Curated annotation (Swiss-Prot):
Its main location: membrane. Belongs to the chlamydial CPn_0129/CT_036/TC_0306 family. It is a multi-pass membrane protein. Keywords: Cell membrane, Membrane, Transmembrane, Transmembrane helix. This is Uncharacterized protein TC_0306. One of its GO terms (cellular component) is plasma membrane. It comes from the Bacteria. The chain crosses the membrane at residues 31-51, 56-76. The keyword Membrane applies. The lineage of its organism: Bacteria, Pseudomonadati, Chlamydiota, Chlamydiia, Chlamydiales. It is found in: Cell membrane.
Length: 398
């Protein structure tokens, strides 16, 4: 019933070890390595000239060997870091899920259906003035920083060897965000085996585009229903790196809204943050901004809509509305739109969304971008968290 995790193949293990070695490479060690390699190259060159040239050319041969050593040293300083960066980017592009877990997700389901994007979400960000749209994509970091200000962070206590648990709460949402540095597969393996959490957890993550299952969800989200009652959503990864900023943001925004809306009946949603092949600073910022805009969008729903998993029938928010909400800290007052957010405390079972695989060292990632806003975070007692079930699981894993 549950996935059996086998050791990773030798090929994947070697790439993982190389990636860790590249990350741990220190500057002093790198200089010593470059100098040693350069001297070896120069020594070999000098020996070749010594045995192949007349004695009159020995002096010039030694000078040439020294010159080769210097050139080799600076060549190592330039080429090796480039190769390391290429290696790290290559290994990071590997799917985080093992083959056994992917096979489990493909076979242990009772039904598979493709969920097309909600037509109402396709009309988002229409009808707004060009100046708001221009500001949105020229300064996404300003909008994201302002969005962080609406969330109250709490840091759970942990032992010296354990990772800290950061929980964010929003005054307009009945659920919290739990930030975890543990990867999706680790959390999935432990949660799916927990008797307390089984049948109460939703899962959302990405699969590599080469996986045959993903072909069924090219235009939307693929949903799998299990006998245990859990749901998994496969988000198609864009295969083209030439994505326009607006299309990238809209696609991620629609996916986030749809995922969260479909999991309102779950106690916990384990979510692997959605990524795209574009690795620029602005693209990474838009990835995080899409999540927080989707959460703000869900704030503007009525009590009954949460209970029926249907979004508010009023016109969707546009760039101007998000500017008003995030920057001005005001409620949008457009025609036929509700004037204040609703917090349906009893209309949904969802208590927390666990964001997995966050890296503190990744300055362009969500956790890295949030670091300036966490220094005032309150050290909270675990019982104060809204998600006590997931807290117990995180403690067991750590």
């Amino acid at each position: 019933m549950y996935p059996v995790e086998y050791p990773p193949p030798l090929y994947s293990s070697c790439k993982h070890i190389l990636s860790l070695t590249a990350k741990q490479l220190k500057t002093k060690a790198f200089v010593v390595f470059s100098a040693s390699l350069s001297l070896i190259i120069g020594l070999i060159t000098g020996c070749c000239l010594l045995f192949a040239s007349p004695p009159a050319f020995i002096t010039s041969g030694i000078c040439l060997a020294l010159l080769v050593s210097v050139i080799s040293f600076f060549g190592c300083r330039k080429l090796i870091p480039y190769g390391i960066q290429r290696l790290i980017s290559y290994t990071k592009s590997l799917p985080a899920l093992s083959d056994s877990l992917i096979d489990f997700l493909k076979t242990e389901s009772t039904s598979i259906s493709s969920l097309l994007p909600d037509p109402k979400l396709k009309n988002c960000f229409k009808g707004t003035s060009s100046e708001y749209k221009k500001f949105f994509f020229d300064h996404p970091e300003t909008l994201l920083s302002s969005a962080f200000m609406d969330w109250t962070p709490q840091i759970g206590p942990s032992a010296p060897q354990q990772t800290k648990t950061i929980v964010l709460s929003h005054y307009c949402l009945p659920f919290s965000l739990t930030l975890s540095t543990l990867d999706f597969e680790t959390l999935h393996t432990y949660i799916v085996k927990s008797n307390k959490l089984r049948c109460h957890v939703g899962y959302a993550h990405q699969l590599p585009p080469a996986n045959p299952v993903i072909r069924q969800a090219r235009q939307g989200v693929l949903q799998q229903l299990y006998n245990t009652g859990t749901e998994t959503f496969f988000i198609p990864i864009q295969e083209s790196a030439l994505l326009q900023q607006e299309e990238l943001f809209k696609t991620l925004f629609r996916h986030y809204v749809q995922i969260i809306e479909r999991n309102l009946s779950s106690r916990v949603l384990l979510l692997e943050p959605l990524k795209t092949p574009v690795h620029t600073h602005k693209a990474r910022t838009l990835e995080s901004l899409a999540l927080f805009c989707a959460l703000e969008y869900l704030c503007y729903t009525t009590l009954g809509d949460w209970g029926t998993k249907e979004l508010d029938p009023t016109p969707p928010l546009d760039y101007k509305d998000f500017f008003t909400i995030l920057i001005k800290k005001q409620c949008p007052a457009s025609n036929m739109r509700i004037s204040s957010p609703a917090r349906p405390m009893n209309a949904t079972k969802l208590t927390t969304i666990v964001l997995s695989g966050l890296e503190e060292e990744d300055k362009l990632g969500l956790l890295g971008q949030m670091q300036p806003f966490l220094f005032t975070a309150e050290i909270a007692h675990p019982q104060r968290f809204e998600a006590t079930l997931i807290q117990n699981v995180l403690d067991d894993i750590a």
